Regions:
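ATP-dependent NMP and nucleoside kinases share a basic, alpha-helical "lid"
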Residues: 106-164
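Post-Walker A helix-loop "phosphate-sensing" segment adjacent to the P-loop in P-loop NTPases
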Residues: 42-50
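Active-site signature of alpha/beta-hydrolase-fold catalytic machinery across serine-
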Residues: 39
Length: 203
């Protein structure tokens, strides 16, 4: 079942009316965070923008140097300090903020490819670890005016996750192995850190 976008959009409008600006959507890999965030921004229209956490992936060369390339997507494979700094600048609402965007066709973040305008009414940021209580990551939650946790049944989420990896070049066997070894441990971290969400959205 898909979340009721009309009800969610109403909640977002109430958030902005109260003076809120930054909405965070957390969830496990494959839960549908990007899809929901994009739908909200498109439904809002002019005045809403995305700020995806995925743009702060460390580069593959850096992951190789740190010997973390075999678990890309884990909390310590992101530039969490850069993400927190970007959110902090967005919250000050004083100037446009340039942020990176993750290009899945390249499996790399492209610096300065998204501009969050100072005039933007609503900024929707989404990612796995927005509610994670860990060094660096615990600084994210205070920067969100509201935080949602998107939850999907594993029977729906895992096959979609495998299909995504296959679509980006992995064999079915390799995709399933990656999901089991990397994505599912990350999903467990997300589930364990869900207590600070203002709203749980199920699909």
């Amino acid at each position: 079942m898909q979340p009721d976008l009309t009800d969610l959009l109403h909640r977002v409008r109430e958030l902005v009316a109260r003076g809120g600006r930054v909405l965070g959507i957390a969830g496990a890999p494959g839960a549908g965070k990007s899809t929901l965030a994009t739908a909200l921004v498109e439904a809002w229209g002019d005045g809403a923008q995305l700020l995806p956490m995925d743009g702060f992936h460390l580069a593959d060369d850096e992951l190789a140097r740190l010997r973390r390339g075999d678990r890309k997507g884990a909390p310590d494979t992101f530039d969490v300090d850069g993400y927190v700094a970007a959110l902090s600048r967005v919250r000050t609402h004083r100037a446009d903020v340039l942020v990176p965007r993750f290009d899945r066709s390249l499996e790399a973040a492209i610096a300065g490819s998204l501009r969050v305008s100072v005039a933007t009414e609503l900024v929707v940021t989404e990612g796995n670890y927005l509610l994670l209580d860990a060094p660096g990551w615990r600084d994210v939650r205070p920067l969100l005016d509201e935080a949602w946790l998107l939850v999907a049944d594993d029977e729906l989420r895992v096959p979609q996750l495998v299909a995504r990896h296959v679509a980006h070049g992995r064999t079915d066997e390799a995709a399933r192995a990656w999901v089991l070894a990397v994505d599912e441990p990350n999903a467990a971290l997300v589930a364990a850190a869900s207590g600070d969400a203002d709203l749980v959205v199920r699909r």
